[in-house]
Every structure is written in C-alpha cells, then in structure tokens.
Amino acid sequence: MEIRIFQQDDFEEVILLWEHCDLLRPWNDPEMDIERKLNHDPELFLVAEVNGTIVGSVMGGYDGHRGSAYYLGVHPDYRGRGFANALISRLEKKLIARGCPKLNIMVREDNDAVIGMYEKLDYETQDTIMLGKRLIVDQEY
C-alpha cells in the first residue's frame, strides 16, 4: 500500500471509490468538493493505492485552529486491513507538523462501525452539537 497526495488524474477513480463507500449525498457534488479542495490545502487530500488502484481516501483540512477530516473511505473489498487507520495516521502527522492541536471528525450518528474504528484510535465523542448552513447550493449529484 502507498499513501500519497491526490493527483488530478485520480478524479474519476476517487469519485467511484466514494460511490462504493456510500459517501455521496445528493446535496454534495463530489466534483465540486474535489475542486474546492484542490484550491485549498490540496496536500491534505490523501489516497491509498494498491497496485495502481485507489482503495481509500481522506480529505483533510486545517484552519489554523482545528483540523478536520472528510471523505474517509476504504473500498469494501479492502476493509479491515488497516487502510483507514493508515490514512488517518498520515493525516494526523501532516496536521501535527503544521501545529494543529486537535482534529475534529464528523461521523453520521448511525455509522457504528466507523465510530468504533475512531474510538480504537483514541477519538472520543464530544459533547457538542454541530450546526451548519449551506452558503452555496451545489447542483444535485
């Protein structure tokens, strides 16, 4: 397995991966999400590759106060082999190198498997409520 920074040629393969991982939602256009990421800290957008095939991804961010992680996904055929742990670990190292004191991760409430994985990596449920407001409405995907 190789973990590397996303490249423009990975575009379609990553979107297909996200489809396999059930990460896509109608209100989020994945092409726009990638384009936005490529314009802001693209070196925090990581992919895991096996024999030239992308099998995992994580899209990280850092605003100078907190880090974030989105689109963590591992192809179903490759789950349980440590790919997600490796992606998060690499992202954590990149964030620490930037002086990031804390990484916040949003997970859907019903995603018990992913919550369990993060708990094994010493992440804890926080007593906060996340609020959001859509500022730009993407075209439905």
Swiss-Prot record:
Disulfide bonds: none annotated. GO terms for molecular function: acyltransferase activity, transferring groups other than amino-acyl groups. Belongs to the acetyltransferase family. YpeA subfamily. This is Uncharacterized N-acetyltransferase YPO3031/y1452/YP_2654. InterPro entries: Acetyltransferase_YpeA, Acyl_CoA_acyltransferase, GNAT_dom. It comes from Yersinia pestis. The keyword Transferase applies. Its EC number is 2.3.1.-. Keywords: Acyltransferase, Transferase. The lineage of its organism: Bacteria, Pseudomonadati, Pseudomonadota, Gammaproteobacteria, Enterobacterales. Residues 1-141 form the N-acetyltransferase domain. It holds the Pfam family Acetyltransf_1.
